[in-house]
């Protein structure tokens, strides 16, 4: 199967075409540029069966509109900064949180590295004071390592002396080439921004892949 990237632009296709072309060449995927619709509800109509990744330029939208699109799309969204380059894809950064959906970061990092074996996955492990939360982090880390070892992926584990939130801030502020993988947190209301989204808004200086939770991976408990 040949996957597809859908790159959205606001006014002119030149805003995003070069980025989409470079990423498509790197991964061996097709790309398609679409003018972003006025309503977030119309975004799903732009997605095809093979669409695996969406691109948005950070500076093209207000933060409110950017999040409106990110939450309307049911695919991972790579938000690009102005200084994007091919070197960006040489490193995938995974800050490990305690929520179970953090495991999906490992799945996506593994998927991306399979299509671009030259990149390195950096797993950033926080130090949590609460033992229950620390155990949940260790569980997520063990899952990620199991997947990556099975795939013989290149990765390294970096232990931080900070909590998940402080580790995330540090990674978001890092200007060195790399993509930070971040889960899209659940929100109750369109005008409400969960804490990690507020951290992204305040601190992000580099590329971030925002991943929606895949509910098909979870079994509801009754």
What are these regions (language model features)?
Residues 1-27, 65-73, 84-124, 139-147, ...:
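Short acidic/Ser/Thr-enriched loop-to-helix initiation segments
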Residues 25-35, 120-124, 150-158:
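Short beta-strand elements in bilobed, periplasmic/extracellular small-molecule ligand-binding domains
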Residues 31-46, 160-168:
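A short, well-structured beta->alpha microelement
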Residues 34-36, 80, 124-126, 158-162, ...:
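Conserved beta-strand termini and adjacent loop/short-helix elements that scaffold enzyme active sites
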Residues 41-85, 172-222:
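Gly/Ser-rich helix-loop-strand patches that form or flank binding pockets
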Residues 126-130, 186-187:
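A short, flexible beta-alpha/helix-coil linker loop
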Residues 129-143:
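GTPase G-domain guanine-specificity segment
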Residues 141-186:
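Glycine/small-residue-rich hydrophobic helix-like segments
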